[in-house]
């Protein structure tokens, strides 16, 4: 937990999900502080205030009195925003949470943008803004100085209008943009490409990992996916759904659950099944979720996972660990977790300690495909459908 002192208010902020090492990673950064110092609140006239990419809810908490709309592609960020509003005893209903695929409010007076990691997502958001902004909309964006590039500024100028940047402060930089009536060519909603060795065409929304081509880890994983599984299979952290798409083809008697914390990932997965295997839609479920929260314990026969090893810019295996714990809770006895991961991450020993077993199915110079089986004698993981309450140090 960390404290942000803004002069007129002080906020206690925590990263989400809470981690044992959370004291070493604060839930806000200098760009948040710089933005809040440079917003002229006297100009807010009752029209909507719109915030983008507020990772842990810092901006939403600071601006809660103005009833902001907060747009994010991350379900985890939405959970973090709600968590920090509660932590500061602020009214959760004062902040309207929007997903990246939701419509934006018309004619906002103030737009505050944290520059996202993916330039494609920023372009999508700026194009969506262009459709709703008014001539007097105030637009201010911020990020670490290293993340504000000429290409970033050019994107604002091309889509919205004249743009300038500030001097750096605490290694952060701001962008000020004015709305102008400038011509802009249309752009497709998705990037499409053929999936190698298949007749499938893959469609990716802006914030999908490896948007422009097949992820090399997924490519390796897909080569050894199982056949003829019955029961329910989960593609956990599904991204664009290519792993689940192949699993759906190879397991005609199974049901498929596609789950990710990214709204655009789940939308891409659903689109890819709709376009490529419409006959199998009735066997599919698509869920935006924090891991497998909301999935009943002991309901899955197989979990397929290509876990991330970072949360935004911070390198961490906490998200992967939560996925593994969720998989153990949700698998039936005899059910299997199959993952692909970089060799250097040492998932083998982590899975062996968690499940009591782990097998290497295949490996190359960069990746390993591992399998763990849930034993009938596994200790109780608790009831209900929430995430497994288990810390890394327990194993």
UniProtKB/Swiss-Prot annotation:
Q: Which NCBIfam families match?
A: PRK15001.1
Supply the name of the protein: Ribosomal RNA large subunit methyltransferase G
One Pfam family from the record: MTS
Q: Which family does it belong to?
A: Belongs to the methyltransferase superfamily. RlmG family.
Q: Which GO terms describe its molecular function?
A: 23S rRNA (guanine(1835)-N(2))-methyltransferase activity; nucleic acid binding
Top-rank taxon of the source lineage equals: Bacteria
The record's subcellular location field reads:
Cytoplasm
* UniProt keyword terms in alphabetical order: Cytoplasm, Methyltransferase, rRNA processing, S-adenosyl-L-methionine, Transferase
What's a GO cellular component annotated to this UniProt protein?
A: cytoplasm
The gene is rlmG
């Amino acid at each position: 937990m960390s404290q942000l002192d803004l002069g007129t208010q002080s906020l206690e902020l925590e990263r989400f999900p809470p981690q044992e090492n959370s004291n070493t990673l604060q839930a806000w950064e200098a760009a948040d502080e710089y933005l809040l110092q440079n917003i002229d609140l006297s100009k807010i006239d009752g029209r909507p205030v719109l915030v983008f990419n507020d990772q842990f809810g810092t901006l939403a908490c600071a601006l809660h009195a103005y009833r902001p709309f907060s747009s994010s592609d991350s379900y985890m960020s939405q959970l973090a925003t709600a968590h920090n509003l509660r932590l500061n005893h602020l009214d959760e209903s004062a902040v309207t949470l929007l997903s990246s695929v939701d419509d934006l409010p018309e004619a906002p007076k103030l737009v505050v943008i944290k520059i996202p990691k993916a330039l494609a997502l920023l372009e999508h958001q700026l194009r969506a803004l262009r459709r709703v902004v008014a001539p007097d909309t105030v637009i201010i964006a911020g990020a670490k100085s290293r993340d504000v590039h000429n290409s970033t500024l050019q994107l604002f100028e091309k889509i919205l209008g004249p743009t300038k940047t500030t001097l750096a402060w605490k290694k952060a930089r701001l962008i000020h943009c004015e709305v102008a009536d400038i011509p802009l060519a249309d752009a497709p909603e998705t990037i499409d490409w053929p999936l190698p060795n298949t007749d499938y065409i893959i469609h990716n929304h802006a914030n999908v990992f490896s948007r422009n081509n097949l992820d090399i880890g997924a490519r390796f994983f897909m080569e050894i996916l199982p056949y003829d599984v019955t029961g329910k299979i989960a593609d956990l952290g599904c991204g664009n759904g290519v792993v689940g798409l192949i699993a759906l083809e190879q397991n005609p008697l199974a049901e498929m659950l596609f789950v990710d914390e990214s709204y655009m990932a789940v939308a891409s997965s659903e689109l890819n099944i709709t376009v490529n295997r419409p006959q199998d839609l009735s066997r599919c479920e698509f869920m935006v979720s924090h891991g497998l929260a909301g999935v009943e314990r002991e309901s899955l026969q197989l979990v397929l996972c290509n876990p991330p090893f970072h949360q935004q810019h911070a390198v961490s295996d906490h998200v992967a660990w939560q996925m593994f714990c969720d998989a153990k809770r949700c698998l039936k006895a005899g059910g299997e977790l199959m993952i692909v991961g970089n060799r250097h991450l040492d998932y083998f020993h982590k899975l062996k300690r968690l499940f009591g077993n782990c097998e290497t199915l295949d490996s190359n110079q960069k990746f390993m495909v591992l399998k763990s089986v849930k034993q009938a004698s596994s200790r109780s993981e608790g009831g209900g459908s929430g995430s497994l309450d288990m810390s890394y140090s327990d194993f």
